[in-house]
């Protein structure tokens, strides 16, 4: 049964039981600040369970997309190395909001799992757990379902406190809670592991496939369990786990959905396809979480959800690099994912281009530092030692963009510990530097009770002023000496204080005897401006007469960008629609950054039209006029106002001919022609329904255009293209040739491995009942598997154990010719071998792989195999 069929079957079953099929909620939880990402089916119903929300249905069923990466629920480091850890997964669920309870929940689960009409899983492959005190659930399983008592396991308070158990669920320290009953599937005795509650429960034999949570109580602040008037049910079935059961495979990565993605990863990286290669699994998993997160409005950034996404992308790119792919490849997998899951989740198809673009941009950005960062890391690791220094970890993070867990991932592969304390010291030092740099911002709430500042900056760039107050280290002082950082308050100021998205002015406050460099201007109070900076010469005292002068070049650049922002705002509303609202802005001398409400990516055509309209207004060179008027009069002009902004009784209205009318207190050009060339250089989403646009003006825009022109010419020269139009064809032809060469190289390596294996079989030790090959060779894990498979296929009585050492780690592969597997099992052999070299392993009777950490024990281990085999054969 395909994964897509299983998903539909589940929803259909519960629909026949009176459940409303509710579509998956976004991965970005709305109105729940406690969650980084949606990580369970019940998240979208949390307020229903708490009684804050009512739905027109009392039974629901969902296929919920979930992400567990970052925050409390973080599976990132295990992904690729286990059979069932994922950053993205689908949770199938059925829910009762005060409708049915334990009896129906258990009966529904059992019917769906075991009925011939639905999944038809053999009943003797299933086991149930219940909370130790939940006699009601126990009796339903025993007397109504008919499950033998030895297959019903009571789980008590196994987490160190009352009602703290694997089988007792709670939303928080207080609130809804209750026992749960889990259903486990037996993957077979050839897999190591024991039943829940046993010492071997962490093994992979018994796997949880279903969890019924019975919200039965409300825990108060005293810890009392008060029965809920309307008990509810929340159940979950992991789609990938159940697909593995239905497809008779052990690992989630062996199901149809992942097999197709793994093949796509191998295709795009040029790597040999192997189920024993963790990097293939990492990338196949990560393309799912990254694509779905971007589809739901998350974009790579340095904070919050965006940073988690960035970490996942960079981990995938690093694993591609590990497989030998140094070119951007990750974004090319989106099309394969859309083919697999676009039917169930149409947002993937709708936003495919946006997802590909976001991934490609992040790949390209990281590619610039990945190789250099890896070289730094390799040099550090080559020096030996069991721990990577915290300074190196920080440098990788700060300079080369390596998230901490990416470095940890690499070190884990080499059995190297991380100096976490040293890294934290470096991080704290960086935070301290940042605090020092920001220590003179207005948010320091400097004490001041003197006269207000009179702002002259609309019409004057220089004023003759008097020093009213001085500050150092957040305290009021009488003087500032050379080298002191501090703040200055003067009676008349030409410096604009940061407000409305425009940064504060910079410049100088000086006299014949001293000079204070103004690096920022902030409001200390509503009408009191503080000039923050450094006393570069002399001594400045309260009461001094000084000259205050704004840096003209930076002020002019700020004005150009601020005026351009107004024109862009109007053009965006005209092109995209009246729903566009300003959500934030940052106007600096370098650029203008403008955030707007818009549900989707702004297309290239729309951006071009916005640019055309703004530049048209610039060429018109109309006057820019500002007037102070009452709010009532301002409204009559049709001036644009920001939703939620608080305005006074009098406001400043800025008009740019017939192009734009808006309330604004910032500084602006005299005529629109002063803006110069206007160019949008980036557009992207920063939150669900919010887009960020960055634009540049004047000489900055000209410089950008010239750089683009130089880049195109360099590409033409590098590709030896005749014209710009020929470049793409040249690049595509080169890429196709390189890909063909990579495939040819992979085939050649495989052939060499097979030839090397044939020599091993010729030299095998004949033990009568079996021919033994136990040897160390030079090969990677994939090649080991291929050689062993080839050798056991050429003989009726071969027992093969091959070992290799790569990057300090031991790889083992065991194989047994099928006629011999009744006496000798490859899984037993590889387990015996792995234990001697510091590892673990297991697998099928005919083929099994494992790893180890102690390469020094290899010779001794290989010698011991003969006596082990003789014992098995006797």
Swiss-Prot record:
Q: Which reaction does it catalyse?
A: tRNA(Ala) + L-alanine + ATP = L-alanyl-tRNA(Ala) + AMP + diphosphate
Q: What is its EC number?
A: 6.1.1.7
Annotated compartments: Cytoplasm
Binding-site residues for Zn(2+), renumbered to this chain: 562, 566, 664, 668
Q: Which GO terms describe its molecular function?
A: alanine-tRNA ligase activity; aminoacyl-tRNA deacylase activity; ATP binding; tRNA binding; zinc ion binding
Q: Top-level EC class, please?
A: ligase
Entry cofactors:
Zn(2+)
What InterPro entries has UniProt attached to this entry? Answer: aa-tRNA-synth_II/BPL/LPL, Ala-tRNA-lgiase_IIc, Ala-tRNA-ligase_IIc_anticod-bd, Ala-tRNA-synth_IIc_core, Ala-tRNA-synth_IIc_N, Ala-tRNA_ligase, Ala_tRNA_ligase_euk/bac, DHHA1_dom
Cofactor: record remark: Binds 1 zinc ion per subunit.
| BP GO terms, sorted | alanyl-tRNA aminoacylation; negative regulation of DNA-templated transcription
Q: Does the keyword Repressor apply?
A: no
For the keyword Ligase, the answer is: yes
The job of this chain, per UniProt, is described as: Catalyzes the attachment of alanine to tRNA(Ala) in a two-step reaction: alanine is first activated by ATP to form Ala-AMP and then transferred to the acceptor end of tRNA(Ala). Also edits incorrectly charged Ser-tRNA(Ala) and Gly-tRNA(Ala) via its editing domain.
Family (UniProt): Belongs to the class-II aminoacyl-tRNA synthetase family.
Q: What is known of its domains?
A: Consists of three domains; the N-terminal catalytic domain, the editing domain and the C-terminal C-Ala domain. The editing domain removes incorrectly charged amino acids, while the C-Ala domain, along with tRNA(Ala), serves as a bridge to cooperatively bring together the editing and aminoacylation centers thus stimulating deacylation of misacylated tRNAs.
Name of protein: Alanine--tRNA ligase
Q: Which species is this UniProt entry from?
A: Neisseria meningitidis serogroup A / serotype 4A (strain DSM 15465 / Z2491)
- Highest lineage ranks of the organism? Bacteria, Pseudomonadati, Pseudomonadota, Betaproteobacteria, Neisseriales
